[in-house]
C-alpha cells in the first residue's frame, strides 16, 4: 500500500512538473542591439523565469543541425541569470560577416542552496525555418544606407508604412530617434507600442540603434530602459561606424528644467548632459571617428537659438554644440518637434540640423563622396531632399 501511494505521489509530481513547464515560450524577440564590427547584443523575453543563451553558427551553407554550435550565456559575473528578460553580448566577430543564431530559454523551477531544478526549454525555430541571421558592421564597406523614424508615440500602425516608404529592406540599419512611446509604463508599453511591430518587420535580423527621447524618460518603468535597449553598453550615448559613416548617438534627456514639478525631483539631466560633453571631448582620438567620411549625430532634441525654446534644447545648444562644432560633424538628425524643419549651418551651429516630423521617415544613402538624404511623408511623397559632400 505504501508503495502504491509513493508511486502515485511520484506520478502526480511528474505530471505537475510537466504541466508547470509545458507553457514556457519566447514572448518577445529576439532583437538585435549595438551591432558593431566585432560584437553584437541579442535580447529577448520569455514568459517564465529562465536561464538564457545564444548559439552561433557561420553562414556557410551547412545545415544548422550539422554540428553542435557554441553557446553564449546570459550571465552576471559568471553566474547565469534567472530572468524573464535576457541579453547576451557576443564578441570576436569578423567585420562585414553574416552569422546565424538561435536563442534558448530554459525554465528554472527552483533554486535552493546549490540545488537548481530546471524545466523545459523554449528556442527559436531552426527546423521549419532558416536560422535567424545578422551581419556585423564593416568600417571598410564602401557605401552604407539607413532610415530613421521618431516620435511614434505608440502608433505602431504607422511604422510599417513609414519604413516601406523608405525601402527599409534595402538599407543597412534602422535608427529610432526617441519618443517611440509617450511614457515608459511597463514592458507591454514597449512591445505593444512599437517593438513587436519592429521585430516582425526587421529587428531580429537588421540592426536597430535607439537614441532615447524625452518621453522614454517618463513613467515608473523609465529606469528600466537600458535593460531593453543598449543593455550591455556602459551608457546610452555611444559611437559606431558602418562604412563611410560614423554615427554619434546622444541622449538629450528631458525638455524642462530638472526642478520642474513634473519630474518630482527624480531627474538630473543637466549633469547627465555635462557627462556626455566630457565623453565627446575624447572622440577626436577614436579611429572610426577620425577616418569616417561622414560624421552624423543622432539626438532627439535639436539645438536652437530661438528665444522661446525650452530648457532642454537650450542646454543642448549650450553644451553639445560647441564640442560638435570643434569635431566637425557633417549633420545632426533630430526629432521632438513633430514637424519637419531644416536649419542650414550658421555662425553658432556650424553643421546642418534636420528635424524629422512624427509622420515622416528619413532615408539616407552614401554614394562616393556624397551622402544623399530624403524625407518622405506617410504618402511616400518627398518633402525634403539634401545632399552632403565629404569634407
Residue positions per predicted region:
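Extended active-site neighborhood of metal-dependent phosphoesterases/phosphodiesterases
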Residues: 103-133, 188-285, 319-323, 342-375, ...
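Acidic, histidine-bearing metal-coordination/catalytic regions of metal-dependent phosphoesterases
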Residues: 21-148, 168, 367-391
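Active-site neighborhood of phospho(di)ester-bond hydrolases with catalytic His/Asp-centered motifs
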Residues: 147-150, 173-179, 206-214, 296-300, ...
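Alpha/beta-hydrolase fold active-site loops
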Residues: 143-144, 172, 237, 244-245, ...
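Conserved, compact domain cores that house catalytic/ligand-binding motifs in diverse enzymes
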Residues: 142-220
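Active-site-proximal segments of metal-dependent phosphoesterases and phosphodiesterases across multiple
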Residues: 263, 269, 287-331
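Bacterial Sec-dependent N-terminal signal peptides
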Residues: 1-25
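Active-site environment of divalent metal-dependent phosphoester hydrolases
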Residues: 154-158, 182-185, 212-221, 255-259, ...
Amino acid at each position: 500500500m505504501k508503495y502504491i501511494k509513493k508511486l502515485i505521489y511520484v506520478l502526480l509530481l511528474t505530471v505537475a512538473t510537466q504541466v508547470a513547464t509545458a507553457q514556457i515560450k519566447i514572448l518577445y524577440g529576439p532583437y538585435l542591439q549595438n551591432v558593431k564590427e566585432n560584437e553584437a547584443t541579442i535580447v529577448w523575453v520569455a514568459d517564465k523565469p529562465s536561464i538564457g543563451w545564444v548559439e552561433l553558427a557561420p553562414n556557410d551553407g551547412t545545415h544548422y543541425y550539422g554540428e553542435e554550435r557554441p553557446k553564449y550565456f546570459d550571465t552576471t559575473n559568471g553566474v547565469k541569470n534567472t530572468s524573464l528578460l535576457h541579453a547576451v553580448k557576443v564578441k570576436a566577430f569578423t567585420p562585414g560577416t553574416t552569422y546565424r543564431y538561435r536563442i534558448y530559454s530554459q525554465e528554472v523551477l527552483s533554486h535552493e542552496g546549490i540545488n537548481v531544478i530546471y524545466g523545459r526549454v523554449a528556442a527559436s525555430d531552426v527546423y521549419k525555418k532558416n536560422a535567424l541571421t545578422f551581419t556585423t558592421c564593416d568600417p571598410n564597406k564602401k557605401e552604407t544606407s539607413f532610415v530613421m523614424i521618431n516620435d511614434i508615440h505608440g502608433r505602431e500602425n504607422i511604422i510599417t508604412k513609414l519604413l516601406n516608404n523608405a525601402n527599409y529592406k534595402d538599407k543597412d540599419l534602422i535608427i529610432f530617434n526617441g519618443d517611440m512611446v509617450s511614457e515608459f509604463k511597463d514592458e507591454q508599453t514597449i512591445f505593444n507600442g512599437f517593438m513587436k511591430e519592429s521585430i516582425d518587420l526587421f529587428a531580429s535580423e537588421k540592426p536597430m540603434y535607439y537614441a532615447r527621447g524625452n518621453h522614454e524618460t517618463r513613467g515608473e518603468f523609465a529606469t528600466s530602459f537600458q535593460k531593453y535597449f543598449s543593455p550591455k553598453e556602459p551608457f546610452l550615448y555611444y559611437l559606431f561606424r558602418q562604412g563611410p559613416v560614423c554615427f554619434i548617438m546622444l541622449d538629450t534627456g528631458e525638455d524642462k528644467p530638472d526642478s520642474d514639478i513634473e519630474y518630482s525631483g527624480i531627474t538630473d539631466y543637466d549633469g547627465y548632459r555635462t557627462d556626455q560633453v566630457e565623453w565627446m571631448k575624447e572622440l577626436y582620438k577614436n579611429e572610426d571617428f577620425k577616418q569616417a567620411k561622414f560624421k552624423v549625430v543622432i539626438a532627439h532634441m535639436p539645438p536652437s537659438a530661438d528665444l522661446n525654446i525650452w530648457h532642454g534644447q537650450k542646454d543642448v545648444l549650450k553644451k553639445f554644440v560647441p564640442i560638435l562644432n570643434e569635431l566637425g560633424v557633417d549633420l545632426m538628425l533630430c526629432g521632438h518637434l513633430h514637424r519637419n524643419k531644416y536649419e542650414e549651418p550658421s555662425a553658432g551651429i556650424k553643421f546642418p540640423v534636420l528635424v524629422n516630423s512624427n509622420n515622416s521617415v528619413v532615408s539616407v544613402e552614401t554614394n562616393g563622396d556624397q551622402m544623399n538624404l530624403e524625407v518622405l511623408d506617410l504618402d511616400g511623397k518627398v518633402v525634403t531632399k539634401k545632399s552632403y559632400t565629404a569634407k
